[in-house]
UniProtKB/Swiss-Prot annotation:
Sequence positions that bind Cu cation 1: 26, 116
Main subcellular location: periplasm
Keyword annotations from UniProtKB, A to Z: Copper, Metal-binding, Periplasm, Plasmid, Signal
A GO cellular component entry from the record: plasma membrane
Stored PANTHER family: INNER MEMBRANE PROTEIN YEBZ (PTHR34820:SF4)
Family: Belongs to the CopC family.
Protein name: Copper resistance protein C
UniProt KW Metal-binding keyword: yes
Species the sequence originates in: Xanthomonas campestris pv. juglandis (Xanthomonas arboricola pv. juglandis)
Length: 127
């Protein structure tokens, strides 16, 4: 009887720890469009899909143009809006104006229910 209780207690503790670990998982980038280091026609939106539902008020992105063909230039911020998708697991970034030919970097910061911020970036070029 004692051995059964010990095994049952161990099973319950392992199950609880696995459940709590998944409940506090950080969001991870699953896929982006455009993908990192891609060369694309000017996208109307940049989509970042994550493993967790995002908290919109704590998640966002900043788009920067880092290179323009034939010109030396410092990085230049590009006006864009970031909003969650309908399912809450994607961040959709919409530039205010069509993107010009050049290279861009999108820095993102997202937060899910665990409230820990996760940051990253992707780069892409517009032909």
């Amino acid at each position: 009887m004692f051995a059964f209780r010990s095994i049952a207690t161990t099973v319950v503790m392992v199950a609880a720890s696995l459940a709590s670990a998944s409940a506090f998982a950080h969001p991870k980038l699953v896929v982006s469009s455009p993908v990192d280091n891609a060369t694309v026609s000017a996208p109307a939106t940049i989509n970042l899909s994550f493993t967790e539902k995002l908290l919109p008020s704590l998640s966002g992105a900043e788009l920067t143009m880092t290179k323009m063909p034939g010109m030396e230039m410092p990085p230049m911020k590009v006006a864009a809006k970031a909003a969650p998708s309908a399912d809450g697991k994607s961040l959709i970034v919409t530039p205010d104006k069509p993107l010009s030919t050049g290279t861009y970097r999108l820095h993102w910061r997202v937060v899910s229910n665990d409230t820990h911020p996760v940051k990253g970036s992707i780069s892409f070029s517009v032909k």
